[in-house]
């Protein structure tokens, strides 16, 4: 097994889930995307994620969060801080909002190019694929696409708390964590942190349900311009950002801080989270399918040139 893949296994074992969408969400996106992969795309995923420890595509989906402690420069590549002000105004401008150090949008574009870059070695291609599997999830979490209060991390809230929410000691959550973890866990009946195998099982169950509920939504309807990734990624980012105006912060920060979000807010948020998880998975699958098709075409072209040289 390649050195990088050994590191991947170690990272996966060593850290407990505290990540965007929660590990359950990221794993569910990966499992759901896998159901829509073409045969060449499945081959590409299996080739790049090959390991002898039984780790699967859902483990790859959590890798980009695991390495942030060792590669701190990758932290800003999981989000973008647009100059928005929900609920009054929502917008994303790549030129204005993505700094020269990079953001989630530039990283998704760069990793798209790196997967099939013939100058990249297998480790670099594997890392690129794992970043994409993870970042498609992050992009569809609305609070990864807002500049307000560090993506909602600075908005302290209650969620299914016993104490009145006007008591600051009751505010055990921030808004970002509610969308990352509390809502996905409640959707799936999870009441505590899960270890590796139960977490996989919960994620697979969620993916199976979303697959059954969305059988008529075709994967080939999604944007797959891997040669010009921003043409697809920017509309997705704008869509996620708009959710902050339309729902996430629709009633304002003060209302969020005074309301237990585990009640009516959760009831309205749950179908939005389901839909965002599904869209992330469907778009990820279509993206990998396009990458696999492009890779196969490049290999055929190279084969023709080799024949001409003989």
Where do the PLM segments sit?
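Residue-level micro-sites within transmembrane alpha helices that shape
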Residues: 5, 139-140
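Cleavable N-terminal signal peptides of Sec/SRP-targeted secreted and luminal proteins
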Residues: 2-20
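N-terminal, motif-rich segments that launch catalysis or mediate targeting to/interaction with membranes
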Residues: 17-135, 142-278, 282-310
């Amino acid at each position: 097994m390649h050195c990088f893949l050994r590191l991947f296994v170690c990272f996966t074992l060593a850290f407990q889930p505290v990540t965007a969408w929660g590990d359950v969400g990221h794993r569910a996106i990966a499992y759901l995307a896998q159901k829509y992969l073409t045969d060449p795309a499945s081959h590409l995923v299996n080739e790049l994620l090959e390991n002898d420890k039984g780790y699967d595509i859902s483990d790859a989906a959590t890798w980009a969060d695991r390495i942030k402690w060792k590669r701190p420069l990758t932290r800003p590549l999981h989000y973008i801080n647009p100059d928005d002000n929900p609920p009054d105004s929502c917008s994303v401008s790549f030129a204005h909002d993505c700094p020269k150090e990079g953001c989630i949008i530039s990283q998704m574009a760069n990793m798209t190019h790196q997967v099939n870059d013939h100058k990249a070695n297998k480790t670099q291609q594997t890392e690129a694929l794992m970043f994409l599997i993870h970042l498609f999830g992050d992009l569809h979490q609305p609070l990864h696409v807002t500049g307000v209060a560090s993506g909602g991390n600075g908005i302290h809230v209650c969620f299914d708390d016993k104490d009145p929410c006007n008591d600051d000691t009751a505010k055990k959550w921030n808004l970002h964590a509610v969308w990352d973890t509390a809502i996905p866990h409640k959707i799936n009946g999870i009441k505590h942190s899960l270890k590796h195998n139960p977490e996989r099982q919960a994620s697979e169950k969620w993916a199976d349900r979303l697959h059954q509920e969305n059988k008529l939504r075709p994967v080939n309807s999604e944007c797959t311009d891997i040669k010009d990734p921003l043409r697809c990624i920017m509309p997705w980012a704008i869509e996620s950002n708009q959710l902050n105006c339309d729902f996430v912060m629709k009633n304002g920060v003060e209302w969020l801080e005074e309301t237990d979000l585990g009640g009516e807010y959760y009831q309205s948020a749950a179908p939005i989270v389901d839909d965002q998880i599904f869209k992330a998975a469907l778009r990820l699958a279509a993206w990998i399918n396009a990458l696999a098709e492009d890779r196969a075409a490049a290999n055929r072209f190279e084969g023709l040139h080799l024949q001409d040289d003989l």
